Amino acid sequence: MSHPRSALLISPPIYDTQYWAHWSMPYGLLRVASWLKTKGYVLKLIDCLEANRTRTVPKRMRKVRKVCSIQEYKPPSWSAFRPKEDERIEYCFGMTPEDLEKRLKQIQAKARSAQRSLFDERVFPEPDEIWISSIMTYWWESTRDVIEVCRRVFPKAVIRVGGIYPTLAPEHAIDKLGLRNPLHLQGRELDPLDPKQQRRDLVVSATIPGANPLPLDLDLYREDGAGEPEEHAELPNYTILTTSRGCPFKCAYCSANVLNEGRKVWVREYASAYEEVKHRFNQGIREFCFYEDNLLLGKTNFLELIRKIADDSDLRGIELHAPEGIEVRLLHADVAKLMRRAGFKRLYLPLETINAKMQKDWQRTHTNMDKFFYALDNAVEAGYKLRCQDINCFILFGLPDEDLQAVYDTVVFASSRVGSVIPMLFTPVPSTPMFELYRDYIEEKGFDFQHLNGKLLPFLDYNRQRYRRLSVRDYLTLEGLMWRLNTKVRNSSFNIGGSNRVEQAFRRVLTAT
């Protein structure tokens, strides 16, 4: 008797100095799960970053990293440890590899017990395949560690790694992850029923066309792997929607063209997305978060979707979010009004900089301050309020060759004109023009991807060519300024007497003036 092919799906933990888990979900992996089910697979999910009902995940100290350096170490004791100004504590957010190994061994023991008493279709078997999603390139180490754990517990299973990291840097993934004789495929070449592919570890780049239009298989969060509900298991209280993929522009720091194999924009049929919203709303989910490369490029389709949501009285109480940002030139008055009516309580606008030269250097030719003001005026006309968290602006800093005065000018402008400022430290992304432009510096420093995390200020030394006395404290002061200005629009206050690095740096600036 032949049995259906089984796959264990794993979303790894992450190693970082900070992590915001509010709308964290392995939506690519969950869409692939829906696709695999159409192929007859039996599935089980382990989301190492599964957030609790307060949208937080556990964290454990892992090591100390020095800013703009490859130096790292573990202190003899964490209890009395205090990092220096140029050091950052790196945490493991989510389920640790050690805890994951215990979980896998439980699955193994249960499967073997069921096998001894004849095959039980209600028990998830030892997996034929293990599918692992890998997101940011600078988080690649946790993917490696998850693979190592899986190898120890399920040595016969073949492994598939997909996501942003293996798409942007497949050679790095092949070289570093410890895969066995891996085959590199584009998503469009993937055939899970091909016997040759079934025998090989795979590195999968780009998207799987057959999975793109499918809904997320959230039911895996409450199933034991064989379609049976787990005791006390619940669906997440939010979900992710993707109604389009791709972007026709090619900003110097952005990888969307590589992730989507070109500039073509794929749009999901709005009726399908609407049915998904209805289904999940009826299951009790109220928050829906759009993750798109450029939300309003498929504007006609998107507007049809949110118009149906706005007009559906059964969806009263829904909350919609677009935290990736909205293209300012496309935020027309009617669009802003419809978004507000449908349930978008907040807008996120990619201001990034008010400096025209920097916009040009970043190849952001499709936006400028006139278009930003256009979007801002339309948002206000639609009922969004300024100088509160209704409208939020992203500000990009920590870039090579940046003009620090322009960053300060942008912060002051955004705070006074808009209100809520969201600081974004720059991380160079492999395969982008900006990464290639500064590749010599990156290689000279000996940086691997984990050292390029923006929170580690990888271009601090580079920018000292322009600002000789530039220090970590200057960036802490800049962050402190943003948090201080944000206190007028947020419920929480900035503790000027506090003990964290940002608060200390800001206090030093005040006492020096």
Predicted feature residues:
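Hydrophobic/aromatic residues located in beta-strands of well-ordered beta-sheets
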Residues: 7, 159, 288, 320, ...
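Short, solvent-exposed turn/loop segments enriched in Gly/Ser/Thr/Pro and often Arg
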Residues: 165, 293-297, 325, 398, ...
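C-terminal accessory regions of radical SAM enzymes
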Residues: 8-15, 24, 390, 404-513
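Acidic, low-complexity intrinsically disordered segments
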Residues: 2-283
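Glycine-enriched alpha-helix->loop->beta-strand junction motifs that scaffold or abut catalytic
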Residues: 179, 340-346, 416-420
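Catalytic cores of alpha/beta
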Residues: 170-175, 334-335, 400-415
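Radical SAM [4Fe-4S] cluster-binding motif and immediate context
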Residues: 223-386, 397, 412
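A structural motif corresponding to the C-terminal end of an alpha-helix
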Residues: 38-43, 153-154, 282-283, 312, ...
